[in-house]
Structures are given as structure tokens and as C-alpha cells.
């Protein structure tokens, strides 16, 4: 069993006799949470792919050209291949070859990077400016904060390190305005709050670079 198949067993709602496309079930995740909870975060272009006969449906291995690494320097400083389940019903990811640059997040198992539908993966040209800035420095600053999902009212923060995430029931839906334009960052006084702005909240501790 590959690492991703094991994860699907925990997250999905399927049985061995039911391999429908609805088997892959993922909880919504703010891009900052996806960043902080990933071993690897990179921008890359897919330049090739190969199907390996592993597991019930195989494993798809994508060859990539890494453009930039945002997280994972000590885990795997240079990524050449990413692994995913070949079947979308097992949360396998389908990527275009020689077409787009992608923002890819994933985990490292046995020296290999794995990703899937439950990871934050997006075409680079579809990321907002705030999301690109978040990848460079803002998300990292907020990894000690907690983004608390709110699915229905009333909901409240219960500690000073929480930001209330309300995209799921807002008019914008998911991914919504907070996902696209805000980062949850610790401010003066030790409280975490949503931040959006062209300048970093504290220039003395941030190495601000353009996306």
C-alpha cells in the first residue's frame, strides 16, 4: 500500500467493492495551512510522466522542472519527480505535461515526494498576488497561528492564536476571499489576526521578496 492509499483509507468513505469517483473526500484547507502542513512547497513545470504498476491502480510519476522552492529545503532541496495515485478515486492528481507551471505541495516518504487531490495544487497563473506573497514570506510567519474553520453560525475564536475562517458559508464560497487574499499572522501583543497589505506587518523580521 502506498502512503497516499493509506491516507485515503482514513479520509475517504469507500469500501473495497466500491471504487467510484466519489471515493476521494477532502476537507477544505486554507492555502496557509496547506503550506505549513506540507513537507515540500514548490513551483514547477511538468515535463514528463510514467505509470508505475504499484497498488490497485498504479502510481503516476511526474517528471518536473523545479522553478522555485518555498518550503522543504532540508527535506529535499531539489525535487525531480512527484508521485501520486494513478486513479482519481484514490485522490490521484492529473497534471498537464509541458503546458503550465504549478504550485505543488506534498509530503516526503522514503525520499520521494507524494501529492494528491487533498493537497493544495494550483496553476501558477491562477494564484492571486496575495497568495504568491504568502508563499514567499507571509504564510511562513503564520505557521504558529491556527486557522479555525467555521461552517455555520455562531462560531468564535477560543484562543489568541486563532483566526476565524468563514469562506465556507460566505457569499464567495470556497475558495473564497480569505483563501485568496489573506494570511493569518501573529501581530503585536501575541494575537493572530487576518492580514492583507502591500507591506509586511513587521519589516524587521521579514525578508520581503516579490513573487
Swiss-Prot record:
The gene is TIMP3. This is Metalloproteinase inhibitor 3. Disulfide bonds join 24-91, 26-118, 36-143, 145-192, 150-155, 163-184. SMART domains: NTR. It comes from Bos taurus. GO terms for biological process: negative regulation of membrane protein ectodomain proteolysis; response to cytokine; response to hormone. Residues 24-143 form the NTR domain. Residues 105-188 are annotated as: Mediates interaction with EFEMP1. Gene3D superfamilies: 2.40.50.120, Tissue inhibitor of metalloproteinase-1. Chain B, domain 1.
Amino acid at each position: 500500500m502506498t502512503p497516499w492509499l493509506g491516507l485515503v483509507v482514513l479520509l475517504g468513505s469507500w469500501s473495497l467493492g466500491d471504487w467510484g469517483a466519489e471515493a476521494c473526500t477532502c476537507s477544505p484547507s486554507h492555502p496557509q495551512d496547506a503550506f505549513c502542513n506540507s513537507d515540500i512547497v514548490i513551483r514547477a513545470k511538468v515535463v514528463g510522466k510514467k505509470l508505475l504498476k504499484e497498488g490497485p491502480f498504479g502510481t503516476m510519476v511526474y517528471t518536473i522542472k523545479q522553478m522555485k522552492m518555498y518550503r522543504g529545503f532540508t527535506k529535499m532541496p531539489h525535487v525531480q519527480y512527484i508521485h501520486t495515485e494513478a486513479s482519481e478515486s484514490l485522490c490521484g492528481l492529473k497534471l498537464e505535461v509541458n503546458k503550465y507551471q504549478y504550485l505543488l505541495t506534498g509530503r516526503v516518504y522514503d525520499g520521494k515526494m507524494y501529492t494528491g487531490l487533498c493537497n493544495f495544487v494550483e496553476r501558477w497563473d491562477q494564484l492571486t498576488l496575495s497568495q504568491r506573497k504568502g508563499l514567499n514570506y507571509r504564510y511562513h510567519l503564520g505557521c504558529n497561528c491556527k486557522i479555525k474553520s467555521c461552517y455555520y453560525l455562531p462560531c468564535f475564536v477560543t484562543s489568541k492564536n486563532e483566526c476565524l475562517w468563514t469562506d465556507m458559508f460566505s457569499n464567495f464560497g470556497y475558495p473564497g476571499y480569505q483563501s485568496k487574499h489573506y494570511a493569518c499572522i501573529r501581530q503585536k501583543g501575541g494575537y493572530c489576526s487576518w492580514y492583507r497589505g502591500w507591506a509586511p506587518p513587521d519589516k524587521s523580521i521579514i525578508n520581503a521578496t516579490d513573487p
